[in-house]
Amino acid sequence: MEQTLKIYFTSDVHGYFYPTTYGDLKRKDLGLFSFARDFKKDENTLVIDGGDILQGSAFAYYCRQKSGSPQAIADIMNDCGYDYYTLGNHDFNYGMDYQNAYIEAHHGACVCQNVVDEAGRACHPYVIHTLGNGL
């Protein structure tokens, strides 16, 4: 019996959610919102991000500098249905407090073996995930 799974993987979004570069405000074929609506999620689907989400765009800068909170970014990732994510090097740019607030607000699991807190604990060193079809 054939069993299938779907994996949607993003990486290096750098806070580009909206389909614009913000410079000229023209609609462009880019940004997480331009394709996340195509995620067809069911019990045999995983949505994963490879990091570098918190820094890079005018929107990400606004979240950090003006609101001081990554809540809006976490809300977007939650709404897109991310199951797992890891941390990229630019996710450390705004400090550990900001990053920890993001981890707390994100409903997915942060899987990252090579980053530990001051007590030596990793976010989740690994995850074993069983899909609805048993895979």
Feature-to-residue mapping (PLM):
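Acidic, metal/ion-coordinating pockets
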Residues: M1-L135
